[in-house]
Amino acid sequence: FAQTPQQELERLQQNYIQSFISNDDRMASLVELLSGIQPEMEISDQVVVELHQRYPFNVEKIAGYMETIREDGSWPDINYNDQKRSGWSVKEHADRVLGLAKLYRAEEGDCHWEPKLESVIHLALGYWFREKPVCKNWWYNQIGVPKTLGPAFLLMKEQLNPEEKEAAIEVMENAKFGMTGQNKVWL
């Protein structure tokens, strides 16, 4: 049957969300393999980025993020003054937001729709939206951060207030499609 463009968009969003939080048989073998591989600290390959985003939840690690987040939404172990062009440590903040959002939406476990977890996500997003971190390397600003926070925004779409949605759109508008060369494959 024919769907309206809005219905098609909603279906695409739901499929994308499921690809991040699904724990079905199709993903089980990938998750099992990923569980045995130590995540890389510096990522420079699109395939590795996408695999990292599908790593199984480390509930203990995420619980640590929930315990250590500061009142302003930052974490004490992230160097927010990092000026490196490669291995920008501030991106870890975006990675944590995605991990928190995945756990919040995952149906298995005790954190599904958990209010404390949701408040930590809002706190962390608030920091990002307020401070608007920028790396000297355009890749993080135009590809790395939007590619990480985009899924988090979709996972939290129904929980974001209008101001957060506007700020999320601003982050995503940093993804530029006018580039040429190899980096086009990231977008």
Regions found by a protein language model. Give the residues of each.
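Aromatic-lined, polymer-binding surfaces characteristic
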Residues: 21-41, 63-187
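Generic detection of long, well-ordered alpha-helical segments
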Residues: 6, 48-56, 118
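Catalytic-loop region of hydrolases
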Residues: 22-23, 48, 55-58, 64
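Bacterial Sec-dependent N-terminal signal peptides
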Residues: 1-7
